[in-house]
């Protein structure tokens, strides 16, 4: 722990807590602050001026990043066309049998993609899936008539995003060995998407602040790009 503490102290000194870093400089610096022995995740937190008690100010959707974020996910496809879903890259495929397996405690997956047909049966598992963030939703295109295209998109790196109860959006943008320009491009794609989703009822400042961090590392603040 002493070595970790010393390393943390050293990298923290690299960051000016009072500075808003231009986005390119921010990513170049944050990659230098990783303190883990493994390749760390580079994450972004966007704090928004939202009242999440109002449904219209709860942001949720999916983003297809321009560059890979270096994370693979286990997809469960609940569909009638199991063969095509499997060929598209789904890790697990099935129909009502998989829903029954979930009901009995099987949760060895990260994402469910399904068609509207199965939502009646899945909806009965709302308490089990909803609390874990696993319930499919049309907003994230995990409930769709084109299950195959959705599987391919998520396997290529498409990610769900949603505001937490404080109005923050947290996502991984890549890893410390990802090219800086790719991290910047992914960040800009997310920021532009968030800007486009500004609720009409929000007054004044919308994006309050942006911060970057690595796994277990310190954070730094980013100047909002024009």
UniProtKB/Swiss-Prot annotation:
HAMAP family: Ribosomal_uL1_B
Disulfide bonds: none
Keyword list, A-Z: Repressor, Ribonucleoprotein, Ribosomal protein, RNA-binding, rRNA-binding, Translation regulation, tRNA-binding
GO MF annotation list: rRNA binding; structural constituent of ribosome; tRNA binding
GO BP, one annotated term: translation
GO cellular component: large ribosomal subunit
Function: Binds directly to 23S rRNA. The L1 stalk is quite mobile in the ribosome, and is involved in E site tRNA release.
Name of the protein described by the UniProt record: Large ribosomal subunit protein uL1
InterPro entries, sorted: Ribosom_uL1_bac-type, Ribosomal_uL1, Ribosomal_uL1-like, Ribosomal_uL1/biogenesis, Ribosomal_uL1_3-a/b-sand, Ribosomal_uL1_CS
Organism of derivation: Mycoplasma genitalium (strain ATCC 33530 / DSM 19775 / NCTC 10195 / G37)
Subunit record text: Part of the 50S ribosomal subunit.
Similarity section: Belongs to the universal ribosomal protein uL1 family.
């Amino acid at each position: 722990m002493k070595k970790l503490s010393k390393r943390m102290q050293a990298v923290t000194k690299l960051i000016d807590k009072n500075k808003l870093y231009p986005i390119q400089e921010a990513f170049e610096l944050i990659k230098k602050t990783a303190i883990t022995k493994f390749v760390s995740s580079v994450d972004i937190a966007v704090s928004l001026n939202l009242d999440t008690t109002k449904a219209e100010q709860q942001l949720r959707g999916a983003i297809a990043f321009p560059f890979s974020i270096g994370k693979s996910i286990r997809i469960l496809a609940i569909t009638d066309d199991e063969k095509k879903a499997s060929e598209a890259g789904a890790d697990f495929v099935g129909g009502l049998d998989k829903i029954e397996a979930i009901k009995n405690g099987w949760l060895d997956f990260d994402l469910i993609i399904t068609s509207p047909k199965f939502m009646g049966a899945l909806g009965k598992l709302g308490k089990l899936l909803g609390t874990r963030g696993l319930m499919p939703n049309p907003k994230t295109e995990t409930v769709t008539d084109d299950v195959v295209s959705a599987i391919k998109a998520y396997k290529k790196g498409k990610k769900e995003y949603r505001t937490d109860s404080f109005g923050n959006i947290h996502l991984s943008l890549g890893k410390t060995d990802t090219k800086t320009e790719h991290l910047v491009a992914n960040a800009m794609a997310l920021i532009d998407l968030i800007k486009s989703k500004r609720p009409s009822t929000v007054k004044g400042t919308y994006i309050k602040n942006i911060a970057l961090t690595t796994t277990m590392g310190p954070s730094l603040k980013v100047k909002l790009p024009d």
